[in-house]
Amino acid sequence: MQNRPTSAYIHIPFCTQICYYCDFSKVFIKNQPVDDYLKALMEEVRHYELPALKTLYIGGGTPSALSAEQLDYLLTQLEHELDFSQLEEFTIEANPGDLTADKIAVLKKSACNRISLGVQTFDNKMLKRIGRSHNESQIYETIDSLKAAGFHNISIDLIYALPGQTMDQVVDNVAKALALDIPHLSLYSLILENHTVFMNRQKRGRLHLPGEDVESEMFDYILSELEKHGFEHY
């Protein structure tokens, strides 16, 4: 078969907490049949008979919400079922605070070579305001632990134009992101989606977002500051 894929995405729909802005396919992990899901996932992987992959991305949900044993099962089975002989990049999403030492050890012995962390903001009050479960100190602890384990291809996600967010807070977030000395940053403006806490609040007039001019100023600052530090916008 021609034009067979060389990239694959695998979805882990479980979360330890549901963020107020997220409309991705996800469920709260407590009392969910996680092991059954992982076994069914492996059956689907076998069904597709994928060719040698160049990139593999495991997202969610929150893949790091899995226990160390479940994560080990997932990654070990993927190595059995998929051809990694041409693999260049294997990314897994994680949340700061979720990546315990035993989970990092599981990642280290696997083929995974890139970690994408859902930081979103460094501001502790804002983290609570958007429904995140980690705090600023856990961001640094997680990245230090990953680097100590030999992971240097680390990316973080940041969201700007959050409810009540100021330009000064964006400046602070960018400065702290740059200080991490990591090779990749993903920054997104907040987009309100249906069936989220934030959209429900917006419909009731209870969500106060930065205006369009302020959001534009935030974007221009982020782009300029990151380019100054050698990052390429794409």
List each language-model region with its residue ranges.
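Local cysteine-cluster metal-coordination motifs and their immediate loop/turn environment
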Residues: 13-26
